[in-house]
């Protein structure tokens, strides 16, 4: 993996983590249950004015800073996680499944927040299994199979349908969506600890020879 053309090794990752690169975890349980929200968002830098600015942007009242995580609603907790990530004006935000357990309205609100972050010039890498939600905010989508990218396509290609996509797994993914009646793909993904050589999809591929 490279970041700004430099290999993102362990030493480089320590340098940019939390500064250039921020991470938003899947679970709101990431928040420390014994620490007030404001202190967690401010972190070691202690920039309370920046914290107030970020809270205002994400419609979090000043009094939220004095609350503990258990006092927050699901939507508020998600916004607190986003606020934590943008505190230091990171260049890249990685969000791991940021919408589980949220109703559609809150999920779309969360994704729209990411869209605004991206439009401001920050890179956003959104990890999700929900294609329909991703299609509403992404520019490009990378399709993973057994931990490997098999295709990177423009959102328009997914909207056009399977004929605009190239890899058989991407096409199968579209077939499996609710609007396509959940058409099942026979077979199983290879075990991560025993990956075969060559194409990981070959045993399930409709184009194999």
Regions from the language model: what does each represent?
Residues 134-136:
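A short, surface-exposed alpha-helical micro-motif characterized by mixed small hydrophobic
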Residues 27, 33-47:
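Q-loop/switch helix immediately C-terminal to the Walker
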Residues 2-22, 158-162, 194-196:
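ABC ATPase NBD coupling module
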Residues 68-72, 76:
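Conserved ABC ATPase signature
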Residues 154-209:
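Short catalytic/signature loops enriched in Gly
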Residues 128-129:
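H-loop/switch region of ABC-family ATPase nucleotide-binding domains
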């Amino acid at each position: 993996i490279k970041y700004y053309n430099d290999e993102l090794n362990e030493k480089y990752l320590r340098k940019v983590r939390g500064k250039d690169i921020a991470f938003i975890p899947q679970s709101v349980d990431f928040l420390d249950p014994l620490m007030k929200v404001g202190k967690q968002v401010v972190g070691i830098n202690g920039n309370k004015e920046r914290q107030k600015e970020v809270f205002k942007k994400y419609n979090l009242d000043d009094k939220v800073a004095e609350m503990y995580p258990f006092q927050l609603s699901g939507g508020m907790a998600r916004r607190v996680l986003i606020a934590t990530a943008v505190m230091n004006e990171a260049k890249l935000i990685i969000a791991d499944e940021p919408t589980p357990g949220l109703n559609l309205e809150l999920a779309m609100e969360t994704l729209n927040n990411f869209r605004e972050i991206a439009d401001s010039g920050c890179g956003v890498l959104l990890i999700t299994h929900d294609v329909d939600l991703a299609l509403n905010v992404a520019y490009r989508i990378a399709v993973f199979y057994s931990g490997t990218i098999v295709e990177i396509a423009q959102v328009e290609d997914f909207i056009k349908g399977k004929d605009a996509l190239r890899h058989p797994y991407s096409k199968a993914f579209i077939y499996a969506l609710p609007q396509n009646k959940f058409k099942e793909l026979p077979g199983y993904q290879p075990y991560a600890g025993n990956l075969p050589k060559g194409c990981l999809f070959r045993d399930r591929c409709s184009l194999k020879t």
